[in-house]
């Protein structure tokens, strides 16, 4: 049986280099979708590039509370999320800490603004995921789900459920994935990083996350980090073969 998988490139619009790498990955047929940072430094140019390269209909939203400048004012008064006018990663390191009422309202307003900005630019969003997986946090998840539903987004990324995961985290992830589907969201059956399936059989209906970028030699890679100011990683893989067909989120 031919297996169908989704390859989603995160961080579109983050900067010029990674956005052009994602465009090249589309041209090579290596990815099926990308999710956009509405507060990315290269957003306008990235959207124009998506139109030019004919993948404007394959864009989702990459919800963000951890990097760059917020689009709204209220969240700037929430020090667990913003300091010095830019998002920090304070709350992301303490996801089990309850949110205050004002924080919940500010988060909802910010996520709504991010989606609205992309919609105003003409993007018909196919799905949602998030920067540093903030949409899976126990207290942020209901807010993200509610905002996405209000915008008619009914497809969302799972919590990672393939690869090496300890017993406690596996339970947490399984509960989230069940909850997400109970909220009415359409999902894949599995979600993995490239390293989770590099030497394994890829199950049918899996989403694989990649971060296309160019290394210092201009090679298209799946970015795993930075070194000396340049992205480092492995060559962006081609998962296509006789047993695997790529599909987009629109086909899910």
Model-assigned labels for residue ranges:
Residues 9-13:
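DG-centered beta-turn motif at the end of beta-strands
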């Amino acid at each position: 049986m031919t297996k169908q998988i989704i390859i989603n490139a995160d961080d579109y619009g983050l900067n010029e280099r990674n956005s052009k790498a994602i465009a090249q990955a589309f041209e090579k047929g290596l990815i099926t979708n990308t999710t956009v940072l509405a507060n990315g430094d290269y957003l306008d140019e990235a959207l124009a590039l998506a139109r030019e390269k004919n993948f404007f209909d394959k864009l989702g939203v990459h919800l963000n509370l951890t990097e760059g400048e917020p689009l709204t004012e209220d969240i700037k008064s929430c020090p667990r999320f913003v300091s010095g006018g830019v998002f920090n990663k304070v709350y992301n390191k303490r996801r089990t800490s309850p949110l205050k009422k004002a924080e919940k309202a500010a988060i909802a307003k910010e996520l709504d603004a991010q989606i609205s900005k992309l919609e105003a630019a003409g993007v018909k969003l196919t799905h949602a995921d998030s920067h540093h997986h903030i949409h899976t946090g126990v207290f942020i998840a209901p807010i993200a789900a509610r905002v996405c539903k209000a915008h008619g987004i009914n497809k969302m990324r799972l919590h990672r459920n393939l690869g090496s995961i300890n017993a406690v985290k596996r339970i947490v992830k399984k509960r989230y994935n069940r909850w997400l589907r109970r909220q009415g969201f359409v999902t894949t059956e599995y979600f993995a990083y490239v390293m989770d399936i590099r030497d394994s059989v890829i199950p049918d209906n899996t989403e694989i996350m990649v971060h296309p970028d160019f290394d210092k030699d201009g090679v298209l890679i799946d970015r795993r980090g930075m070194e000396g100011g340049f992205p480092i990683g492995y060559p962006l893989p081609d998962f296509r073969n006789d047993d695997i067909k790529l599909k987009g989120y629109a086909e899910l």
